[in-house]
Amino acid sequence: DSISLVQSYFYLTGFAGKELSEDAFATMDTYFNKLRESGKKAVLRFAYETAFMGRAGTGPTLEDVLRHMEQLKPFLAQNTDVIQVVQAGFIGAWGEWHSSFHGLEKTNDSKRTILEKIVWMTPKNRMVQVRVPEYKNLINKEDQSYNRISFHDDFIVIKPHQWDGGMHE
């Protein structure tokens, strides 16, 4: 037995307001090649911000996020073999969908737009994970992409909490 899945975060912090650079793609490509060489796959998340509770100094606009997803789509398609799943990041602290500098998590319209674009950019043979169960319901249940959305829990749910999606024990 050996490690086969790696939680992988790519922080796009320096790219708010501009295009992703060739150097950024070269760095990600080097990382994916190392995963490929070692027989591992990524649980992949993109994020911009690493602070919360009003401490982030800057963050992406909705337009930044959507533009970067346009750039990332062909790159993810080229690296599908080393991607196990894509987590719906991009918004707020650590891509956890809270505390974003521009308040991207504050309206269902912006969350829905971002989630639909994440599903769009993710290769069709890969699932997308959301952190809170009700985020899946931002997508119309009749939409084929609805069945490609699952969830992950990166905190232990032991008591009722505003972010637990009603899943507390």
Predicted regions: what they are:
Residues 1, 23, 29, 64, ...:
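Acidic-enriched, low-complexity/disordered segments with a strong bias for Aspartate over Glutamate
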Residues 1-4, 169:
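Short intrinsically disordered, low-complexity coil segments enriched in acidic
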Residues 3-50, 61-65, 122-126:
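Aromatic-lined substrate-binding rim segments of carbohydrate-active enzymes
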Residues 15-18, 51-57, 94-98, 137-140:
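Extracytoplasmic/secreted cell-surface and envelope-processing proteins
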Residues 21-31, 62-72, 105-117:
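Well-ordered, non-membrane alpha-helical segments in soluble/globular domains
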Residues 34, 38, 71-79, 117-121:
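Alpha-helical structural signal in soluble globular domains
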Residues 43-53, 72-105:
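Active-site groove signature of glycoside hydrolases
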Residues 85-87, 92, 96, 100-169:
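Catalytic-core regions of glycoside hydrolase
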